[in-house]
Amino acid sequence: MTKSIFEYKDDQDWYLASFGSYNHLTCFGDDEAYEQYVDFFQGLTSTLDVSGFQLHVVKHSSDLRLVSFILDCLKEELGRDLVVTQHQGTLLVSEGDKLLYVHVPREGVSLDDFFGSDNKSDFGDVLLIATRNEGKTKEFRKLFGKLGIKVENLNDYPDLPEVAETGMTFEENARLKAETISKLTGKMVLSDDSGLQVDVLGGLPGVWSARFAGPEATDAENNAKLLHELAMVLDDSKRSAQFHTTLVVAAPGRDSLVVDADWKGYIGREPKGDNGFGYDPLFLVGNTGRTAAELSTEEKNEQSHRGQAVKKLMEVFPAWQNKQ
């Protein structure tokens, strides 16, 4: 069987190609030219899952002409319906309704040119944090920024309705908020629900932690209520408890991602420490004898339920996001 030889030749460009047992590139020119071609060649053939394509570059002036030649070869030999489109200095390779490869010139392109200055903010993955707390948002922005993801919060969407936390578990509440807001906005949404669980109280205050002493209760009132409930529990070992956090990430058309974590300790007999919030002044961390309110912010973030849950999330999030 005769092997097909493909050729394109004009005054500025001359390419030869065939199919063999492995991908291979040769060219006339210096090492710098070869490195430029081989990076492009390997990236394109790998992304398109092509094997056995052998290319020789005799003369080259146009990246568009080279890509068009390669795609013509693949169409004729393999029946691939690949199309190249020029866009603001880049070359976009698509097949059907899928964008498969983007070739950017070595000097790069302006983001304003590529996206359009009026629409640039609409591009790229966005994670909406279901909170109005700018401090919490800032921390998540640092973490997800490393993954190339823009982070927004509810302050960016003032017209969104409040989602009532009517669930009976932390996961139900976190899932309810994340999935509801995701449906309303069409965006990827992260929500959390956290609280204190005291074993001798059957897990209370649990999902009612913020309103244990009443709908508008202050931290001091909730702490006083908890001490009252434990007044007759004299054995310290019976005052075991844990802070719990559940994080849920929801996105349209996919199963939600759920992670959770606990921070174990005991309930003290009086508030201690000036840091933190909520039940921190009563929560004795493990067997340290120190309350969460006596820890520095760095110490707390390193070991707390929320810190542990966020670490778990960052470990599993990339795989979840890439899952089709």
From Swiss-Prot:
GO biological process: nucleotide metabolic process; purine nucleoside triphosphate catabolic process
Cofactor dependency: Mg(2+)
Record keyword Hydrolase present: yes
Record field: catalytic activity: XTP + H2O = XMP + diphosphate + H(+); dITP + H2O = dIMP + diphosphate + H(+); ITP + H2O = IMP + diphosphate + H(+)
Stretches for region Unknown: 1-126
Gene Ontology CC: cytosol
Positions that bind Mg(2+): D193
Enzyme class (EC, first level): hydrolase
Location of region: NTP pyrophosphatase: 127-324
MF (Gene Ontology): dITP diphosphatase activity; ITP diphosphatase activity; metal ion binding; nucleotide binding; ribonucleoside triphosphate phosphatase activity; XTP diphosphatase activity
Keyword rRNA-binding recorded: no
Cited InterPro entries: dITP/XTP_pyrophosphatase, ITPase-like_fam, RdgB/HAM1
Keywords noted in UniProt: Hydrolase, Magnesium, Metal-binding, Nucleotide metabolism, Nucleotide-binding
E.C. designation(s): 3.6.1.66
Location of the active site: D193 (proton acceptor)
Cofactor note: Binds 1 Mg(2+) ion per subunit.
Binding site for substrate: T131, R132, N133, E134, G135, K136, S194, F277, G278, Y279, D280, K300, H305, R306
Description of how the protein assembles with itself and partners: Homodimer.
Family membership: Belongs to the HAM1 NTPase family.
Function: Pyrophosphatase that catalyzes the hydrolysis of nucleoside triphosphates to their monophosphate derivatives, with a high preference for the non-canonical purine nucleotides XTP (xanthosine triphosphate), dITP (deoxyinosine triphosphate) and ITP. Seems to function as a house-cleaning enzyme that removes non-canonical purine nucleotides from the nucleotide pool, thus preventing their incorporation into DNA/RNA and avoiding chromosomal lesions.
Name of protein: dITP/XTP pyrophosphatase
Organism: Streptococcus thermophilus (strain ATCC BAA-250 / LMG 18311)
